[in-house]
């Protein structure tokens, strides 16, 4: 029987915040494969450079992706903290572009890579990760993510 787990994550970027639900299975002994469903709330701001002024409105993005997580140095580290690396890929869409069953919105490709560490707090696995998130809507940002997993 596969080892199935669930989790929630809060991701903070320079231009907004995301809330995610993660479910997955243990793929190999030190690897996990997860499905990620979440929303990203983009902040409203004005960006002024020497060439242009850009106004951005608040947007809500729907994120559907898959994530592969590998635990590193499992045999070598003594202690509570375990380093991990993650690779994530999938699709993201602006919720305002979804108008019904005939028009499912403007979906764009996204990817993310990151590194962090895991530790247990009682029976809940906590994870702190720093990611580089690239998609056409947020234009590539660093993200800090706190996730909690349980069985």
Language model regions located:
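Outer-membrane beta-barrel "beta-signal"
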Residues: 117-120, 139-151
């Amino acid at each position: 029987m596969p080892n199935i787990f669930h989790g929630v994550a809060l991701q903070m970027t320079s231009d907004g915040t995301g809330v995610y639900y993660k479910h997955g299975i243990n793929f190999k002994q030190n690897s996990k494969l997860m499905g990620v469903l979440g929303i990203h709330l983009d902040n409203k701001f004005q960006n002024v450079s020497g060439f242009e002024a850009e106004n951005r409105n608040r947007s809500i993005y729907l994120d559907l992706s898959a994530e592969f997580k590998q635990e590193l140095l499992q045999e070598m580290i003594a202690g509570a903290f375990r380093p991990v690396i993650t690779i994530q890929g999938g699709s993201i869409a602006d919720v305002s572009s979804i108008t019904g069953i005939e028009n499912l919105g403007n979906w764009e490709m996204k990817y993310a890579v990151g590194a962090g560490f895991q530790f247990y707090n009682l029976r809940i696995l906590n994870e702190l990760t720093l990611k580089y998130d690239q998609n056409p809507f947020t234009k590539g940002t660093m993200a800090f993510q706190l996730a909690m997993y349980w069985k």
